[in-house]
A protein has these predicted regions:
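Extracytoplasmic/surface-exposed domains of secreted proteins
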Residues: 26, 34, 52-56, 62, ...
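Short edge beta-strand/loop segments characteristic of extracellular beta-sandwich folds
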Residues: 88-90, 101-108
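Glycan-recognition and catalytic cores of secretory/periplasmic carbohydrate-active enzymes
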Residues: 80-86, 95-99, 114-145, 152-170, ...
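Short Pro-Gly-centered flexible turn/kink motifs
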Residues: 60-75
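Trp/Gly-enriched beta-strand surface patches
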Residues: 1-62, 110, 123-124
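Exposed beta-sheet edge/beta-hairpin loop segments within beta-rich domains
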Residues: 56-63, 363-369
Length: 499
């Protein structure tokens, strides 16, 4: 079986014809497709692949290079139809003291305007709380928007907002609204389930067995992988194509869908967690992580801080790869298409026996901006791990400092990344070399404040220079005016300019 040629073995179509009508029973969903040439064929997408949808196709006639397939698509139009109002509230809920605004999305052809009703859900049913007058916000993209402010309501409980026949989901107002089920599921479920090189249990359930314990073989040179990884004419390491590289069968989280480990995903997630740990002093324990036996137990505390255990897990992959390869890996990914399309237990991708044909490949690259960004992420992770895994912390810092020292800067993108690395290394070490580099590049930082402001601001106290702080503040004030203007362009009060 090969996913690329799966369609060479065409299953029988459900139906064949020149016209196809979808949902003829529903005027609001009905549409018709008519082919002016080759017949339409309706397939079950599960036959040749595992696609959970129906497939409508026409075969391209042999030798036809223009006008090979011509379809006419006719949606059914219901005169006077209007999109129903959509009432939007926070999915998390609200703290009693915070601003509370419900936003109602309206069809732009709907002239009607009404009041909204805030109701409380009690053990005896609904109790009216307040009639809300809307603020006309105006048009954003395809819709008109109204805003209904109910900040004054602070009594804790369950609520919903109703506008005409539409209503919001039920939400909470409570002082403990952020204590459960907000960011916590990332630590409780998402990251543990994605952990590579582990068996992940949750009571009776096994999310996946020990996987990829045979990682990884050096990728072939001059190879453009089907997922987009590119190995150039050299491996950039002492290893030759096909060599088993030690130190890679530990740590990391699976990328969604194809289970690969990208350096920016691994180091980047560690960075997110490290900054959250520092900013909010997160101390949360719901999971057992046993690195020695490569076992994870979800919802079984082990007395160790989960966020630090996850930073450790990511750094084991990044630092392990760096120390084995002498450089960062670009990514670790399966070598065969049959593995790439795997739906099921990640442990089924390889046999966990090093050195055979099913082992994943490790790719390398020469990419200064990515290497310097990773240096910043390594430095921050090193801080978080100090006192938790001192050896790994020291190795992460060594890698960060070496990357900072040896990576060349040839363009603004690389310079921005080196400023990022300098800021985090200054916070980690306090060394003058990093402080001096930030001071030398003050003008560049101010000029690129949109991208570098948050980075420089993190280090401003460590730089401890009045001129640096003053110039940074001036640039930040200009940026704030720009962001305020962008935020005013949406009913949600956040900037939105699609690329």
């Amino acid at each position: 079986y090969n996913p690329i040629v799966a369609d060479d073995l065409i299953a029988e179509p459900y139906a064949v014809g020149q016209r196809f009508t979808c949902r003829p029973d529903d005027a609001y969903s009905r549409f018709t497709i008519e082919s002016e040439g080759a017949p339409l064929k309706l397939y079950d997408g599960r036959m040749n692949h595992n696609n959970g949808w129906f497939v409508l196709s026409s075969e391209i006639p042999e030798g036809k290079t223009e006008g090979a397939v011509r379809w006419i698509i006719k949606p059914n139009v219901v005169p006077g139809w209007l999109s129903a109002p959509v009432v939007q509230v926070s999915q998390v809920g609200y703290h009693p003291a915070q601003p509370k605004v419900a936003i109602v999305e309206l069809d732009r052809n709907d002239p009607a305007r009404g009041q909204a009703a805030l109701v409380k859900i009690t053990e005896n049913g609904e109790v009216p709380v307040q009639t809300l007058n809307g603020e006309e916000w105006g048009q954003f993209l395809r819709y008109e928007y109204l805003r209904f402010d109910f900040t004054a309501v602070q009594e804790e409980g369950l609520y919903k907002v109703r506008y005409g026949a539409s209503e919001s989901a039920i939400f909470r107002i409570a002082s403990d609204v952020y204590d459960r089920g907000v960011w916590q599921p990332v630590l409780e479920y998402f990251l543990p389930v994605q952990m590579c090189h582990m068996r992940v249990n949750e009571k009776y359930r096994v999310w996946h067995d020990l996987c990829h314990d045979d990682d990884a073989r050096m990728a072939p040179v001059n190879r453009n992988h089907f997922d987009g990884y590119v190995q150039g004419p050299s491996t950039l390491t002492k290893y030759q194509p096909g060599d088993s590289v030690p130190g890679l069968n530990v740590g990391g989280w699976h990328d969604a869908g194809d289970f690969d480990l990208r350096i920016e995903s691994q180091a980047g997630e560690c960075y997110i967690l490290a900054l959250a740990y520092e900013a909010f002093n997160v101390n949360y324990d719901a999971t057992t992580v046993d690195q020695a036996h490569k076992v994870v137990e979800i919802h079984q505390p082990d007395g160790r801080n989960d966020i630090l255990q996850q930073i450790e897990h990511g750094m084991l992959s990044v630092v392990g790869g760096y120390r084995s390869l002498g450089r960062l890996y670009r990514g670790i990914i399966c070598s065969h298409l049959r593995q790439y399309v795997l739906l099921g237990d990640s442990a089924a991708m390889t046999k966990n026996i090093k050195g055979d044909d099913d082992d994943r490949w490790v790719f390398t690259e020469d990419n200064p901006p990515r290497e310097l960004t990773t240096a910043a992420q390594l430095a921050a992770s090193s801080r978080a791990l100090k006192g938790f895994n001192d050896e790994l912390s020291a190795h992460a810092l060594e890698a960060a400092q070496e990357l900072y020292r040896v990576t060349r800067v040839e363009d603004d993108k690389a310079l921005s990344a080196k400023i990022h690395a300098a800021a985090e290394l200054l916070l980690t070490t306090g060394e003058e070399v990093y402080r001096s580099f930030l001071l030398e590049n003050l003008n560049f930082i101010a000029k690129n404040i949109k991208n570098l402001g948050w980075i420089a601001a993190r280090a401003v106290k460590a730089v401890n220079d009045a001129h640096f702080e003053s110039e940074l503040r001036k640039a930040m004030q200009t940026l704030k005016q720009e962001l305020d203007q962008l935020s005013a362009e949406t009913p949600y009060g956040i900037p939105y300019h699609p690329y």
